[in-house]
Regions:
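Generic structural signal for hydrophobic
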Residues: 39-43, 70, 99-103, 128-129, ...
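Active-site-adjacent beta->alpha loops and helix N-cap segments on the catalytic face
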Residues: 34, 57-70, 86-95, 113-133, ...
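Conserved N-terminal beta1-alpha1 strand-loop-helix module at the mouth
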Residues: 1-69
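Glycine-rich phosphate-binding active-site loops on the catalytic face of alpha/beta enzymes
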Residues: 109-114, 162-177, 224-241, 245-248
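Active-site mouth loops of central-metabolism enzymes
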Residues: 20-34, 53-56, 78-92, 138-152
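C-terminal alpha-helical cap/extension of soluble enzyme domains
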Residues: 4-12, 194-254
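Catalytic cores of alpha/beta
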Residues: 92-98, 148-162, 209-223
């Protein structure tokens, strides 16, 4: 940040990298190498982790070079949970492990948003992978018609953290219209409140791709709430929201 130049007082106490709270997780849905380089040059100070969305890594040209760029910027990368599910449904878990080793990935997502997976089996994958990786486990369905009651969200998050997950992710997709949100994009505020009563907030990354959703979380839970599925071009705007330097959050931290 440039605050030595600006000398602006009374900014919120923003956590510093490497962060455990106030994480910004970016969703890379197919940036080119040049776009990745430009993105990191402009925004790397405010990015904590990058997800290569769904199965985009499979069709990404120069994938290993892209991963190298992120490594050189000290930003962990993980493959989208849909890719994990694609391996599981084909009974190729060992092949997935080999992929992680070959690509020197340090973080991994375990999800069941597209796949019917018994929760005990999901927790077993988390337990196994957590021996070697930081596991992010995603809770919630990608199906807008499937409503999961709050107690079930909480039970799943608790069990997945107990199994070894580093963070649990509140599902919203890249659209922000399922899971913790209604199809209009409105936050299911009662669900979020129930979750936070039982799950430490620093253990949850809330997928919040829309600005209104980011503002809602920041207004209630402060500048250091973990937010995910942020578009690369929205990283700097989100950081201004976290600091109260945008109209939507101007008076949050005064």
């Amino acid at each position: 940040m440039n605050n030595e130049l600006f000398a602006l007082k009374n900014l919120p106490d923003r956590s510093q990298k490497p962060r455990n709270t106030g994480l910004t997780m970016v969703m890379d849905k197919g940036l080119s190498l040049r776009e990745t380089s430009d993105f990191l040059d402009n925004s790397s100070d405010f990015v904590d982790i990058v997800k290569l969305g769904f199965g985009t890594s499979f069709v990404t040209k120069n994938l290993e070079e892209k991963l190298r760029l992120y490594r050189e910027a000290n930003i962990p990368v993980y493959f989208g949970g849909t890719l994990f599910e694609a391996y599981i449904v084909r009974d190729q878990f060992n092949d997935y492990r080999r992929l992680l080793e070959k690509t020197k990935i340090t973080h991994v997502e375990v999800s069941d948003g597209s796949l019917e997976l018994p929760h005990l089996e999901k927790c077993q994958y988390i337990q196994e992978l957590s021996k070697d990786y930081h596991v992010l486990s995603e809770v919630g369905s990608k199906d807008a018609e499937k409503i999961i009651p709050p107690y079930e969200w909480i039970e799943q998050m608790e069990r997945e953290l107990e199994a070894g997950a580093w963070k649990v992710i509140g599902e919203a997709r890249e659209s922000g219209t399922v899971g913790i949100f209604r199809n209009s994009g409105e936050v299911r505020s009662g669900l979020v409140a129930e979750i936070i009563r039982k799950i430490p907030i620093e253990k949850v990354i809330w997928e919040a791709p829309q600005k209104s959703q980011q503002v809602w979380f920041l207004s209630l839970y402060g500048s250091n709430v973990n937010l995910g599925n942020i578009a690369p071009h929205e990283v700097l705007p989100l950081e201004t929201l976290r600091l109260g330097l945008r109209g939507d959050s101007f008076d949050f931290f005064l």
